[in-house]
Amino acid sequence: MNQQIFREYDIRGMADRDLTEDVVINIGKAFGTIIGANKTVAVGCDIRLSSPRIKKTIIEGIASTGVNVMDIGVVPTPLVYFAVHRYNTDGGIMITGSHNPIGYNGFKMLKGKKTIYGEAIQSLKEIIINKKYNVGTGGIKISDVISGYMDTVLKSLSIEKTMKVVIDPGNGTAGPIVTSLLSNIGVDFICLNCKPDGHFPAHLPDPTVPEYMNELIEKVKSSKADIGIGFDGDSDRIGVIDEKGNMVYGDRLLGVFAKDVLKNMPGSTITVSYTHLRAHETPEHL
């Protein structure tokens, strides 16, 4: 087992080389052991070519420790967090390579409502090395959480003016859900590379890389759209293009989001990292 896959905030490696069936089933057993018997966890995956295999195997490992599994299928990463909170599960795992190159995959994990990171990830590794697993028989249930997520999001949305939007899911998980949401709220939109495809035929889904945003930029300008939004492969990261075709980076987006929060919830505290490029400037402009 390549111990370098156990990183600070997730487990990640080359799917065929590092995330073999033996490694994955043992990660599942270790995760199930820290969750505890007779508990329930939600498990979802992205559309990478290796994800179905990895999901099937890790579910097998988790269930072998007496933990019940809610299999929520192919979903964006935020839906695993939604499932954990909505259905009050005891944890969750998202199988995803995120914005990394095609051959990668990995795991984002929660115990209870909290993300597993740092020493907790290293503890998983030690359980695997020592092979100290709980033993039991957990149930596996296939569950649809997308409809509940859609209802929740739609109830929280309020569109103040009509906009024309171009989106580029990059053939990742965002396409079906985002297009459905935009249709339901009556937004005029164009979708590029909407169909989920783990080969990522258009470009790697990483909206922080300017060259991967070129198609979106050109479409925003040619269609005279108000905004363009690009997503990464598991839909927990976005890149934004303004109406002139310029990239709007995360430091500026923070100010936009903070301003909206303060408008609706005056007096709220906005916490930022001071490694953030505009952390000093943002409060002065809100």
Enumerate the predicted regions with their spans.
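Conserved small/polar residues in nucleotide/adenosyl-binding loops
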Residues: T275-T282
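Gly/Ser/Thr-rich active-site loops/lids in small-molecule metabolic enzymes
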Residues: N193, N246-M265
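N-terminal small/polar loop signature for handling phosphorylated ligands or for N-terminal nucleophile
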Residues: V41-Y104, V187-I241
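Short beta-strand-to-turn element immediately C-terminal to the catalytic PLP-Schiff-base lysine
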Residues: M109-G112, G239-E243
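An N-terminal, well-structured beta->alpha segment
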Residues: M1-I58, S64-T65, S143-M163
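A short, N-terminal amphipathic alpha-helix
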Residues: K29-A37, E218-K219, K259-K263
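Conserved PLP-anchoring active-site segment centered on the Schiff-base-forming lysine
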Residues: V41-V43, V80, I167, P266-T271
